[in-house]
């Protein structure tokens, strides 16, 4: 059994270089919600040195709200914004001897693309037109994952160690009770359920089936590094190999 571990980096949280020793995929902020050219360059350089897959982490242009405020924009604006951010990170990656391997939207863009076909199609179209070999990271069972596959892109279904789920498989919004899970033992147990049994218990008690191919370890919490070490050790202790999506066997991608 195999799984990818990913983290959102380049967001000014201070533990990026150390986290890159523990994850297999890095989603690097492209400057629109956090980070900037120097942070992008640092993260890319470290990822290249450590052999971690480089991913773009585009967002709405919303640094005031860390990209977490939902926006209603025309598809053309979303398309252009994603292209702009992919181009910026790709240029830096090329200069540092690396290349982008995947794209994972950030914050509100991620959540809206997960449920809104128009937004999903706009993001997917930008990725496909930029480089159809790029993989797409999206919420497991989401509209976004379906749109990516319909467009012929490789889609990697993502689950979250520290987030609550609703019965329909969507994440509990951050402003609602049950959205965030703080207890590390609970997070580890839930992650093992998602990876080994492909299910997670929703806040209402229901079991939700999902295809966990990559686990997000948020890099912006105060204990992010300690938890990343614990979750990787827990996975390896039960025989799960931690590898980047490009190394996943066919049965793990199904």
From Swiss-Prot:
Name of the protein in its database record: 5-oxoprolinase subunit A
Catalytic activity: 5-oxo-L-proline + ATP + 2 H2O = L-glutamate + ADP + phosphate + H(+)
Organism this protein belongs to: Burkholderia lata (strain ATCC 17760 / DSM 23089 / LMG 22485 / NCIMB 9086 / R18194 / 383)
PANTHER family, per database record: 5-OXOPROLINASE SUBUNIT A (PTHR30292:SF0), UNCHARACTERIZED PROTEIN YBGL-RELATED (PTHR30292)
Gene: pxpA
Principal EC category: hydrolase
Keyword check for Hydrolase: yes
Family: Belongs to the LamB/PxpA family.
Molecular function per GO: 5-oxoprolinase (ATP-hydrolyzing) activity; ATP binding
